[in-house]
């Protein structure tokens, strides 16, 4: 019998409310998550992530969510999870400082290559090279000053390949015309300070911010800087849109606190068991998108790009506390051509990426013969990927549309070991933890595709979709081996997905409902011998709901909820498990979570005041594959308010955890004990924005 955590949060009433609202709605057109319900309904929402060009969001035969610029400005995110709380099916688990782990139609995935399950991108280009992802890579994106954040859920479209397994997060830089001329100063609890500014001139816009935070736990905190330069220009018959973005993070990291429900102890919450921990990360990337009309109804686009990333951090979560430095540099090109006849649209493209990366791990102090001091790993990898894709959409009738697409992709790795082959330990070690495989070359050939059928009326879209996604192994899964594993004989992970969805608008109500089933095969995992192997199977089923309701000219309500089951679908000898785990919930996969925002805007009543009360919840979840240890879940209340002191000056307040709940942002069970990244107590940030 499968053990299941009992329901602990009063979410049932919230889901019931949303369900009743949907049940009483007359079907209509598409919704946008966040507060799009407050926007002018005459302005049609578009999504660019699905095809690399603007598509009417209402008609897309795939599940999506978007958080627009006005939402981002009101949220004023200090961390990425404050944005993705508003996306149905998404939970970004907050670590310490700016660290995070992503859940998108999935559990919160951990491990060397877990980040490969998600595509995180800026303007459609992966923040990091697909074979060199990092679980914390969202901290590279300039979310505060983005023009929009778009999320596609599940294996979505063929313009994305490796890593677009569970979904795509695409952060769009604001167009020059969209960039606000303003300066913003913020100050808050525990020495939080942020200065941000943005402005545009002619065809160029610049946005920049700098943040300093003193930290809640002892000897923690961070300094971070981000900047985005945007170009929009026309040259002869070409339209040119480009961006240059960089970020720098200097973080003093607080480690897990230990002990069952220690996050409820006020003294324990402030402790930092790892005052020596740190993370320094630097990133920069740029692209130019050249596009021009082709044969009247078509378009040609060429988008060359480059990226550079470097990060050094202490592995405080491991007892021997090694230090890792990883970096990579890339150049690439996205090329696409599209056209349209009366009933048939098509596009075809090619993507090329070349990356040179490296990883160096060393340990300062001797821990044991099996975890010695000195160099553990030192290697370089040259990676090349080449992909071609095509997609067609056929308007069968005025209301029925059929979509189909396919993508083939090859990934090649040329690995060079720069230190001694074999174990990093002395010959007398009984079970050396670190093994350096000999230099080698690997290649992977994969494909992805989708079929969709959709029905459209003036105010409703219904769709059914089948899709396949994949991810090639990450370089760390192949070349950072342990416990005597001489070679990682692993293959690409694949996922097959079926999805049904309906979205619409009825008067003041918007809604979006999607149900999905996904089966993953050849899942890469670490077995009980600490070998990286393929062959696991997992199943993912869920229901997602997003709602927006304009109650009257002042009050509005938005909300999202997700109910899902993520389980092991094969009997594997997973590290940390005992006996059989087939049928168990995958650890760190709450059955339900979501958020509701109640908003008031008194501008129509002649009062320059707006406010938002937010309730968010995460249900309890298991911490281990045997489903023996669990976290109880939590609920939080947050408040945001803005007061226009004058036409050019606005005072803002962001207050989080209003009830001062003791909770964990992330819970874990490892090395024989409960471990928690502690949630912060009640906090407040005051801001002053000057429009120029």
Task: Provide a role label for each language-model segment.
Residues 196-197, 202, 299-315, 454-469, ...:
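Membrane-embedded beta-barrel scaffold of Gram-negative outer-membrane proteins
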Residues 125-153, 172, 489:
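Short acidic/polar hinge/loop motifs at secondary-structure boundaries
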Residues 81-125:
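Extracytoplasmic beta-strand/coil segments of soluble accessory domains associated
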Residues 616-624, 642-692:
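C-terminal beta-signal and adjacent terminal beta-strands/loops
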Residues 257, 261-264, 356-370, 412-433, ...:
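Surface-exposed extracellular loop regions of Gram-negative outer-membrane beta-barrel proteins
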Residues 340, 395-402, 410, 510-520, ...:
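Gram-negative outer-membrane beta-barrel transporters
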Residues 187-212, 217-254, 276-299, 340, ...:
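Transmembrane beta-barrel wall of Gram-negative outer-membrane proteins
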Residues 117-118, 155-157, 168-199, 207-208, ...:
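Short strand-turn segments of transmembrane beta-barrel domains in outer membranes
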């Amino acid at each position: 019998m499968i053990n299941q955590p009992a329901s602990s949060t009063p979410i049932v009433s919230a889901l019931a409310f949303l369900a009743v609202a949907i049940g009483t709605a007359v079907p209509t057109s598409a919704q946008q998550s966040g507060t799009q319900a407050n926007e002018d309904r005459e302005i049609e929402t578009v999504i660019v992530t699905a095809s690399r060009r603007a598509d009417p969001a209402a008609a897309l035969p795939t599940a999506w969510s978007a958080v627009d610029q006005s939402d981002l400005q009101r949220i004023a995110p200090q961390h990425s999870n404050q944005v993705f709380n508003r996306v149905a099916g998404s939970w970004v688990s907050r670590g310490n400082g700016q660290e995070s782990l992503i859940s998108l139609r999935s559990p919160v995935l951990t491990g060397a290559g877990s980040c490969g399950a998600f595509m995180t991108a800026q303007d459609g280009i992966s923040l990091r090279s697909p074979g060199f992802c990092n679980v914390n890579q969202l901290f590279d994106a300039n979310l505060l000053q983005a023009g929009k954040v778009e999320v596609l859920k599940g294996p979505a479209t063929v313009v994305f390949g490796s890593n677009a397994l569970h979904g795509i997060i695409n952060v769009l830089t604001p167009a020059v015309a969209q960039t606000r001329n303003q300066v913003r100063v913020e100050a808050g609890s525990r020495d939080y300070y942020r200065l941000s500014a943005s402005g545009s001139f002619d065809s160029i816009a610049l946005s920049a911010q700098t943040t300093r935070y003193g930290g809640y736990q002892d000897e923690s905190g961070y300094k971070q800087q981000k900047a985005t330069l945007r170009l929009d220009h026309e040259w002869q018959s070409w339209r040119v849109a480009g961006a240059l973005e960089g970020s720098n993070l200097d973080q003093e990291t607080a480690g897990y606190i230990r002990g069952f429900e220690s996050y409820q102890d006020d003294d324990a919450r402030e402790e930092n068991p790892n005052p020596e921990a740190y993370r320094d990360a630097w990133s920069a990337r740029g692209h130019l998108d050249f596009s021009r009309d082709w044969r009247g109804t078509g378009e040609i686009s060429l988008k060359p790009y480059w990226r550079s990333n470097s990060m050094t951090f202490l592995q405080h979560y491991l007892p021997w506390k090694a230090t890792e430095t990883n970096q990579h540099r890339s150049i690439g090109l996205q090329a696409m051509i599209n056209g349209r006849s009366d009933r048939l649209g098509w596009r075809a493209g090619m993507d090329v990426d070349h990356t040179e990366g490296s990883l160096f791990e060393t340990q300062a102090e001797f821990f044991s013969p099996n975890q010695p001091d000195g160099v553990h790993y030192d290697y370089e990898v040259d990676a090349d990927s080449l992909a071609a894709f095509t997609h067609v959409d056929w308007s069968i009738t005025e209301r029925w549309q059929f979509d189909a697409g396919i993508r083939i992709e090859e990934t090649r790795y040329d690995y060079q070991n720069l230190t001694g082959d074999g174990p990093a330990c002395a010959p007398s070690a009984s079970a050396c933890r670190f093994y350096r495989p000999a230099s080698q070359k690997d290649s992977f050939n994969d494909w992805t595709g989708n079929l969709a059928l959709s029905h459209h009326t003036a105010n409703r879209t219904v769709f059914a979709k089948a899709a396949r996604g994949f991810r090639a192994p990450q370089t760390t899964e192949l070349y950072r081996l342990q416990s005597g594993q001489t070679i990682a004989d692993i293959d690409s992970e694949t996922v097959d997905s079926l999805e049904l969805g309906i979205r619409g608008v009825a008067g003041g109500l918007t809604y979006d409902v999607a149900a999905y089933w996904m089966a993953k095969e050849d899942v890469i995992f670490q077995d009980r011998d600490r070998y990286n192997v393929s062959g696991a199977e997992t199943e993912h089923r869920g229901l997602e709901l997003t709602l927006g309701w304009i109650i009257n000219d002042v009050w509005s309500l938005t909300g999202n909820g997700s109910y899902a089951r993520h389980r092991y679908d094969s009997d594997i000898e997973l590290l940390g498990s005992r006996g059989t785990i087939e049928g168990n919930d995958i650890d760190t996969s709450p059955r339900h979570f979501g958020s509701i925002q109640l908003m008031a805007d008194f501008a129509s009543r002649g009062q320059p005041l707006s406010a938002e009360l937010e309730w968010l919840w995460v249900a309890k979840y298991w911490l281990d594959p045997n489903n023996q240890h669990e976290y109880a879940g939590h609920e939080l209340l947050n408040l945001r308010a803005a007061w226009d002191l004058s036409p050019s000056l606005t005072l803002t307040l962001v207050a989080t955890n209003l009830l001062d709940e003791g909770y964990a942002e992330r819970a874990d069970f490892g090395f024989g004990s409960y471990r928690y990244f502690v949630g912060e107590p009640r906090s407040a940030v005051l801001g002053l924005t000057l429009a120029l």
